[in-house]
Amino acid sequence: MPPRYPFGGGAQSDEAHHQPLERRTTAEAQGNSFTHGHTAYPTYDMGAEPHSPPHVSYDPYLPPSTSGDHSGYEMPSANYNDHHRSSYPQAIHSPPRMTNPYANSQPRQGSADPFDEHDGDVPLLPRGGNYAYAPASHFDEHGNHVGPVDKYADGDDDVMDEDAVNGQARGRLLHTQVPHDDDYMPGGFDPNVLENGQAGGVRFGKIPQRVPRRYKTLKRVELYHGNLVLDCPVPSKLLDKLNDRESREFTHMRYTAATCDPDEFKTERYTLRQVLFDPPRRTELFIVLTMYNEDEELFTRTMHGVMTNIAHLCTRERSKTWGKEGWKKVVVCIVSDGRLKINSRTLACLAAMGVYQEGVGKNVVNGKPVTAHIYEYTAQLSIDPSMHFKGREKGIMPVQILFCLKERNQKKINSHRWFFNAFGQILQPNICVLLDVGTMPRPRSIYHLWKAFDINSNVGGACGEIVALKGKFWGALLNPLVAAQNFEYKMSNILDKPLESVFGYITVLPGAFSAYRYIALQNDAHGQGPLCSYFKGETLHGGQSDADVFTSNMYLAEDRILCWELVSKRDSAWILHYVKSAQAVTDVPDQVPELISQRRRWLNGSFFAGIHSIIKFGYIYRSSHSFGRKFALHIEIIYQTIQLIFSWFGMANFFIAFFILTSAMSDKIHALKVPNLVLSYIYVAFIIFCFLLSMGNRPAGSKAGYTLAMVVFALLTVYMTGAAIYLAVDSILNATGPNGGGTDALVSNRTFVNIVISLAATFGIWLIASIMFLEPMHMVTSIVQYLLMAPTFVNVISIYAFANINDISWGTKGSDKVMTDLGVVGGSGNNQVEVAIPTESKDINDAYDDAIHVLSNKAPKAGPGPVDKEQKQKDYYATVRTNVVLCWSLSNAALVVGILNISSIGTRTIYMGFLLYSVAGLALFRMMGSTIYLIKRLFSGE
């Protein structure tokens, strides 16, 4: 009877490693002799005891000859050099003829035959029946393939394999023209229901298997310094695609089961591949990608962008640091927050690149629960967002990847602790780059970011420009939410960031795309410093602290705390810098609930962190900054204080402007007096409505209410703008009339001066600054949407933020339950453990097939997620929340009453002019800073 899992044959099959048996035997002998020569390191080729069961589960279809093959897992050698190389054949640059597993099946009734269009390419979606087909029908009793031969269609790109049976057929992963349905997902589950009962049709936590795997061998392995470390051969099907198959870093993936806290990683004698090379590799750039449950499109967008940047570093052959071998100085660390939370299709991408292998990880090692699964591999292939492989022929260079899959969901700040305190302590990098999955750095951005540190040794942190994703043909700008955020991002990168960079203190380096000098972040001998302050947020939001509401909200913006602690570090003179040339694209919230929830954390965190920097400004005197730098920081802190005051009274000032303008128009047109009064009542009513919504309703649960408030405020803004235009035009007509008095009367008209000159100055400054930075398009495509959204930012989002300062649930406690679904590694004495791992080439390749198969099928569109009925409003800090909201609302109300009811009309006009000129003055101040930045940039060589 043929084997049930015929991929690659058994241990006696030449397909096992695609090489002759005698060559493999020689290679194994050489490998064994090499490993036995290094007794200081563990040997993973120990073999099984004669009385040990050969497999965890007996399979009657498994050929007996495979039971004794345990050559797959060898030691993680300290020397990854030419003396120990895999004996895989040289790279095949033209792929072999392929087999077509569907050649004898019939197409579905009423559907087009995909083979007619693709000329023999294996289609992504079979013609019918179950995807979990029985591949044994294509093999004889000896395991030899007898199926039909498929054609290979050449294309411009090497594209990812759609491996229906043997993983050798090439074709696009996603054929949009091929008829298909979404009723099937690998693994045999309903695409509309997740494993946990949620809708969406995408698994989380593991790659779905088309056929249950039972080929696991019980092996006895030595612990490496008391830790479980395995060198796992990558699938031979992946090796067939690689240009370089000689070095062990390309032929083996290294797995480490970490059972410690990140801070104890080094003391527990864990290590990483880079320090095991002879000589050890120096890490110049250490890049971290933090992710949670992002899908494969977001992941590949970021990962492919990073690999493209590394390829650019390797093209800079005249550089003293970079060049052809520059990739050896870069390590990319991917930290996924929670093993059961990771998207299965993202995991499949990692498996397709060779970074991840299903079935290797374990839950418990010698009674210690595993806290993180660490996979190390040097990938030669990149996957772009269209699901195509890109290799050396497209300029992609090898990339050292460190994939840390955390066992529990402990939030982003814990992921950064693994990055800085665990892996950073081992690698001791020069520059650390922080990226969020979903943010795509442009091809040379990382180089420009690194260059800022190389040019100026005082730079301790830097950030690039975050660009809103506009979509194809800028179609995303049709959404007013996206357009408004696009304008906001652009003006911040043109006016705010350059100004702060000139002073040397940028209030926030966005965690989505920023970089730090590693030594600048280190704590002092007493354990105090930037990283210590930064990681306080993990315990505050992990339920392990009784911190007050001020501190808790302050650490919602822990990246702002890190920036301040870095600039004010004791006996240091680090500065923060903005790099205009470094750009990264990210998608912004395009739905009302997402926008409000995101801005709630931003506003609360930035507000309380701003207060923190003002109160703790004295820390600047403990630093080693020069007198000139300290003087500049004094000016900046005054500017930040003014900004904070305007932010606090923003709600009142917007209503005052609305009331004064509409009242002035009522004086000109008496018929509008009653309608304007009604509009003022509507304005106040919706302010109250927003308070009621914010106190008891989540944005996702009250989307219609929040959207209604945003629309009403936008309409009121349109009316207010019309009133301002009418008053300006009326003033001009009166001044130029027969009895108007001409220009002198126009200049003496306070209403005209306040409205026209101040607003013209503001918009003029925006336009001039945008032209100076050679980016004026947002002034055309997005300014109207931004002006209409302005009252939403001032009223709706601010009210929600202040009304929910008690919500500090940005970080949550992870579950303390120890999972055992991956398996438990038990000790057998003498520093050895017994571990069940896939060793057969067929089983390793089958797991690789599953990953390719998952990516080969179009992901079903996720429907709206169900509302969590268990969610309830938290009452933590409720009293403080009430007091803050009362203070904020009453102070704004007092300002409104004082200006509109108590003062005279002349006072109103003066205050209106003060508001408008303040906006213009702050814009002018920012423009001066950005101009200085551009001048410095011309001479700095950035």
UniProtKB/Swiss-Prot annotation:
Skewed-composition ranges (Basic and acidic residues): 14-26
GO function terms (MF aspect): chitin synthase activity
Enzyme class: transferase
Superkingdom of this protein's organism: Eukaryota
One GO location term (cellular component): chitosome
The EC number(s) this enzyme carries: 2.4.1.16
Residue numbers spanned by region Disordered: 1-124
Residue positions with a glycan: N604
Keywords of this entry: Cell membrane, Cell wall biogenesis/degradation, Cytoplasmic vesicle, Glycoprotein, Glycosyltransferase, Membrane, Transferase, Transmembrane, Transmembrane helix
Record Pfam families: Chitin_synth_1, Chitin_synth_1N
Residue intervals passing through the bilayer: 641-661, 674-694, 709-729, 755-775, 783-803, 885-905, 909-929
Protein family according to the UniProt entry: Belongs to the chitin synthase family. Class I subfamily.
Protein name: Chitin synthase 4
